[in-house]
């Protein structure tokens, strides 16, 4: 992806988030974006929209199907994308919208990797740790299970990491012995 394309994607995303923020609809916009991204991930919609073999009329039909359950702002955004023939960048734009929402609302996705699935109490404690240590609000809590950690957990938020895993501690101990 070129710098020009990246700038275009970011500008579309920033504009959509700005409009939603002005109208106090960030939560609605975020729900719409997550629903559409889920559709992208369960289908090959991204390939269809970026393919030159698929006629523009077919792309219009595909995006019209996405408009049914969305807010006015998302529907206007999708129409603008169609009007300017930027469908090929829609997936990246939606990802950028989520990033912009996170920046504006200071609410980031939290990835927690542990050796066992977390209980509800542990999840709430993770949210508290994130709020205290990173000074951000926890958005979605993405839970991963990795038995190789042996114990402890790894919390990752906005490119910052807390690693209390036994595996890392054993590696550090091994390095100290050398």
From Swiss-Prot:
GO molecular function: proton-transporting ATP synthase activity, rotational mechanism
InterPro entries (UniProt xref): ATP_synth_OSCP/delta_N_sf, ATPase_OSCP/dsu
Localization: Cell membrane
SUPFAM superfamilies: N-terminal domain of the delta subunit of the F1F0-ATP synthase
Bilayer topology: Peripheral membrane protein
Cellular component terms per the entry's GO annotation: plasma membrane; proton-transporting ATP synthase complex
Keywords on record: ATP synthesis, Cell membrane, CF(1), Hydrogen ion transport, Ion transport, Membrane, Transport
Primary location group: membrane
Pfam families from the UniProt entry: OSCP (PF00213)
UniProt keyword Transport, yes or no: yes
Function of the protein: F(1)F(0) ATP synthase produces ATP from ADP in the presence of a proton or sodium gradient. F-type ATPases consist of two structural domains, F(1) containing the extramembraneous catalytic core and F(0) containing the membrane proton channel, linked together by a central stalk and a peripheral stalk. During catalysis, ATP synthesis in the catalytic domain of F(1) is coupled via a rotary mechanism of the central stalk subunits to proton translocation.
Family of this protein: Belongs to the ATPase delta chain family.
Oligomeric form and interacting partners: F-type ATPases have 2 components, F(1) - the catalytic core - and F(0) - the membrane proton channel. F(1) has five subunits: alpha(3), beta(3), gamma(1), delta(1), epsilon(1). F(0) has three main subunits: a(1), b(2) and c(10-14). The alpha and beta chains form an alternating ring which encloses part of the gamma chain. F(1) is attached to F(0) by a central stalk formed by the gamma and epsilon chains, while a peripheral stalk is formed by the delta and b chains.
Annotated protein name in UniProt: ATP synthase subunit delta
Species assigned in the record: Streptococcus pyogenes serotype M4 (strain MGAS10750)
Gene behind the chain: atpH
């Amino acid at each position: 992806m070129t710098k020009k394309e990246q700038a275009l994607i970011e500008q579309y995303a920033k504009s959509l988030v700005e409009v939603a923020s002005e109208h106090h609809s960030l939560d609605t916009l975020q729900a719409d974006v997550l629903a559409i991204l889920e559709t992208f991930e369960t289908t090959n919609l991204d390939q269809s929209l970026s393919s030159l073999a698929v006629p523009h009329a077919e792309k219009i039909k595909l995006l019209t199907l996405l408009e049914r359950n969305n807010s006015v702002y998302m529907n206007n955004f999708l129409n603008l994308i169609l009007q300017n023939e930027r469908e090929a960048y829609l997936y990246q734009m939606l990802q950028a919208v989520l990033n912009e929402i996170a920046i504006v609302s200071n609410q980031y996705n939290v990835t927690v990797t542990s050796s066992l699935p977390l209980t509800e109490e542990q999840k709430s404690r993770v949210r508290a740790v994130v709020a205290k240590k990173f000074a951000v609000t926890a958005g979605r809590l993405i839970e991963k299970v990795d038995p190789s950690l042996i114990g402890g957990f790894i919390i990752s938020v906005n490119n910052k990491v807390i690693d209390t895993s036994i595996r890392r501690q054993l590696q550090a101990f091994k390095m100290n012995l050398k």
